[in-house]
């Protein structure tokens, strides 16, 4: 069904960047992606991409790396679908999903109805991302915590913000952040590079770097975007330069870029559910946006192991 899904993506620009066919081509490593689709009158009216993996005897649907959300999507045409129609289309998508031992997906925030999945035996937990509506940048800046504003001004006096650059520097700085916390980096460089090349080819990303007069890189980040929203995707700081405020400055510059260059009104922080990170999102004035994590475990063995 991948060819039909590719056509669906071309015909429906509201499909988020994470669910675009070319994006899935780049990030679906150690497995394969496909899509359930519903066709009516020779048109795809509903689609649901998924990433199928195998581990030992188990087949399961999971989230690819670098993919914040997937889920079901409906064709945009004319009046919105009624709840009855939405239930019917979602039910048809569910029926086309392959038989697997386990399923887990994070649905896009645009999906507000998971009831058909509940009726089919799926479960869900509510998760949160944080978003800004960029109607007025002055208002957004005024809504930022005063300590954050001081960090922005402090960094502006000590570093320059560069756009573009190379993915190797982003990887190096991001890895420093994980090393500082004694955490394993969840991806390898070759996958990040393939991911970044796809984004660059489709003009769907910008890189930001904070560099001081000596050439030292304090912070790095990446912003990815689609037709509606920009997402603060990957970021990191040099642990020895964290107090410069450069990471906060890069976040503000990404917000400005979203409004002033991309002309988009929605900025998504891509989470976070982590308490210390969530606090920073709120200090930028961002508002909670719920989304669904939906799962189902069909294998008795996996259910027993999950007790």
Predicted regions span which residues?
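A conserved beta-strand-loop-helix scaffold within acyl/acetyltransferase catalytic domains
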Residues: 1-41, 47-57, 108-243
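Short, high-confidence coil segments that cap the C-terminus of an alpha-helix
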Residues: 31-33, 99-102, 205, 262-264
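Conserved acyl-donor/pantetheine-binding loop and adjacent beta-alpha core of acyl/acetyltransferases
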Residues: 54-71
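Aromatic (often tryptophan-rich) hydrophobic motifs at membrane interfaces
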Residues: 75, 91, 195, 201-306
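Short, conserved charged micro-motifs
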Residues: 79-85
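Conserved beta-strand-loop-alpha-helix junction that forms the acyl-donor binding cleft
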Residues: 105-113, 269-276
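Short, surface-exposed amphipathic charged segments that create phosphate/polyanion-binding patches used
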Residues: 144-147, 303-307
